[in-house]
């Protein structure tokens, strides 16, 4: 059993039984999870910023860093592994987008990331079935390949599922 660990700006998909797709310390970043329950395919992207036009060179180098590139790439990878080309049957969830700089989030990056992801999912004909977004705390996210359950944890707040 080998877990797939994603850093900021990374995306990945797993079909490995008994494993998880994980990302740590989501602050203003947003994680989008996609799960196909019949095929047991689990995918996630760890998005840092809403739009690649902010830094096109970075977008070419690390497309998962931006919502407008990373979310469609994750979906494309899910389809490549056998998911329906229109997203039928996919269970999509989103997490993160916190305002971690208490009272000093001038750019509202978390909120902008949340809105950008929702817009992109809408364009792809999907929407999240569950969300754990906003607030002012960091989250660690684990997506279970066998079940599609998403575990969330936060120091001082415990663990929960969405």
Swiss-Prot record:
GO aspect biological process, one term: chemotaxis
UniProt cross-references to CDD domains, sorted A to Z: CheD
Superkingdom of the source species: Bacteria
Key word Hydrolase present: yes
Entry keywords, A to Z: Chemotaxis, Hydrolase
Example of a GO MF term: protein-glutamine glutaminase activity
Reaction(s) the record says it catalyses: L-glutaminyl-[protein] + H2O = L-glutamyl-[protein] + NH4(+)
EC number: 3.5.1.44
Hydrolase found in the keyword field: yes
InterPro entries: CheD-like_sf, Chemorcpt_Glu_NH3ase_CheD, Cytotoxic_necrot_fac-like_cat
Stored Gene3D superfamilies: 3.30.1330.200
Family, per entry: Belongs to the CheD family.
Main function: Probably deamidates glutamine residues to glutamate on methyl-accepting chemotaxis receptors (MCPs), playing an important role in chemotaxis.
This protein's name: Probable chemoreceptor glutamine deamidase CheD
């Amino acid at each position: 059993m080998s877990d797939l660990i994603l850093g900021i700006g990374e995306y990945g998909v797993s079909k490995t039984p008994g494993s998880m797709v994980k990302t740590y310390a989501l602050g203003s970043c947003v994680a989008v999870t996609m799960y196909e329950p019949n095929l047991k395919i689990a995918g996630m992207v760890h998005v840092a910023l809403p739009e690649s036009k902010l830094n096109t060179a970075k977008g070419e180098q690390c497309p998962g860093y931006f919502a407008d590139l990373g979310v469609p790439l994750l979906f494309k990878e899910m389809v490549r592994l056998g998911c329906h080309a229109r997203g039928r049957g996919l269970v999509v969830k989103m997490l993160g987008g916190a305002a971690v700089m208490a009272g000093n989030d001038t750019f509202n990056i978390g909120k902008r990331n949340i809105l950008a992801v929702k817009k992109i999912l809408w364009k792809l004909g999907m929407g999240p079935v569950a969300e754990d977004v906003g607030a002012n705390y960091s989250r660690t996210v684990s997506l279970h390949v066998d079940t599609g359950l998403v575990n969330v944890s936060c120091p001082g707040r415990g663990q929960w599922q969405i």
